[in-house]
């Protein structure tokens, strides 16, 4: 993978879904060769697994009923199973859920959004906790990410880790439109990009395909393919509880 930011990865991600709301074979093949092949395949498998849950915290007030329209990690399997009664209520909830999810998709790509988001990936290994992913800080709690990070620490002990893993762009004339692996995105005087070829796991790549591309891509996996769940959280207590549960 080339770290040159003339390669605008987020534009490629945005073309992964074509105008027919289908995966574009040409772009999929291109990305397959652009990234390490096994890594890209694992990221695509995650997107189709049904194990990815995007939690969204909105600073404004949201009614408790809107929170209940989407399942949590714990009850997702049950909530996908149709009930023997109350079909009309389920249809109404599904319609409301779609509207709510559409709204979240648009807000997540609004440049002025105040929404905070985290990805939780359900694991299938016994006694393994869910995996926590944060794009804004380029962090993943998985063992693979931690092993890459530790490797960089060991290789460059005399150099500050930020000098090894962060690429700074100070010249405004060289600013990139790419959103992939960008941190501190709201700075007006500097751009910072993580050297993703040194520090990336399939969870970060999959999450980037969702949130560093386009609303079309995010909408495909959350509303069309329905393999990624959007879960809105309306208050800070629930948000903190989510993080505490992941740590514990």
From Swiss-Prot:
Please give an example of a GO cellular component term from this record: site of double-strand break
Q: Which terms under GO biological process does the entry name?
A: DNA recombinase assembly; maintenance of rDNA
> Family, per the entry?
Belongs to the SHU2 family.
**Ranges of Low complexity composition bias in the record:** 81-97
Keyword Kinase in annotation? no
Q: Where is this region: Disordered?
A: 73-99
What is the protein's name according to its record?
Suppressor of hydroxyurea sensitivity protein 2
Q: Which cysteines are joined by disulfide bonds?
A: none
Q: Which UniProt keywords apply?
A: DNA damage, DNA recombination, DNA repair, Nucleus
UniProt function note: Plays a role in a RAD51/RAD54-dependent homologous recombination repair (HRR) pathway to repair MMS-induced lesions during S-phase. Required for error-free repair of spontaneous and induced DNA lesions to protect the genome from mutation.
- UniProt keyword Nucleus present: yes
The gene from which this protein is expressed is SHU2
Localization, UniProt: Nucleus
The record lists the lineage as:
Eukaryota, Fungi, Dikarya, Ascomycota, Saccharomycotina
């Amino acid at each position: 993978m080339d770290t040159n930011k003339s390669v605008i990865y987020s534009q490629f991600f945005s073309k992964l879904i074509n105008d027919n709301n289908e995966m574009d074979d040409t772009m999929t093949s291109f990305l397959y060769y652009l990234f390490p092949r096994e890594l890209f395949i694992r990221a695509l498998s995650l997107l189709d697994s049904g194990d990815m849950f995007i939690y969204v915290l909105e600073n404004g007030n949201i009614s408790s009923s809107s929170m209940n329209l989407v399942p949590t990690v714990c009850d997702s399997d049950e909530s996908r199973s149709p009930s023997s009664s109350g079909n009309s209520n389920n249809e109404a909830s599904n319609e409301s859920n779609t509207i709510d999810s559409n709204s979240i998709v648009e807000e997540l790509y609004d440049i002025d959004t105040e929404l905070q988001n985290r990805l939780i990936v359900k694991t299938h290994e016994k006694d393994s906790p869910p995996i926590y992913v944060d794009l804004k800080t380029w962090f993943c709690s998985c063992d693979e990410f931690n092993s890459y990070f530790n490797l960089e620490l060991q290789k460059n002990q005399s150099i500050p880790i930020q000098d090894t893993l962060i690429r700074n762009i100070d010249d405004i004339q060289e600013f990139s439109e790419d959103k992939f692996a960008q941190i501190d995105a709201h700075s007006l005087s500097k751009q910072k990009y993580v050297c993703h070829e040194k520090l990336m796991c399939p969870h970060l790549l999959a999450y980037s395909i969702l949130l560093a591309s386009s609303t079309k891509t995010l909408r495909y996996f959350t509303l069309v393919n329905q393999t990624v769940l959007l879960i809105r959280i309306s208050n800070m207590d629930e948000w903190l509880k989510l993080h505490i549960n992941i740590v514990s």
